[in-house]
Amino acid sequence: MIPEIIRNTIFIGCGSFIGGAARYLISVAMKAMSKGFPWGTLVVNLVGCLVIGLLWGFFSKNSSESSSWALFMTVGICGGFTTFSTFSKEALIMLQAGNFMSLLAYVAISVIAGIALVAAGYYLVRI
């Protein structure tokens, strides 16, 4: 029998692979339309916020579901899909370039819409 911590680590790693690969593919696909604004990162982070809200609502409502499955989906896939470090790097690049309006819009949309989408996802499932 595999210890739970090893099993969960494997589940998270597999989910991270899926989420990271999906993030890369979306970023590549959106690069052509970016024109200097990090649309790919914004889209994956906002989609990830909605998805983690939906999953949080689902797993809190259905506590009988496996914690390994919840870790695979939330920490693994959503964690691999979304990226705070790239968001921060892109924000710093805008700051260094003096693109203050783009920086303000990027940070405000990311944070405000991100929180709103997590809440929307959570409450949609909890209804």
Please place each PLM-identified region on the residue numbering.
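Membrane-interface helix-loop junctions in multi-pass transporters/channels
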Residues: 1-127
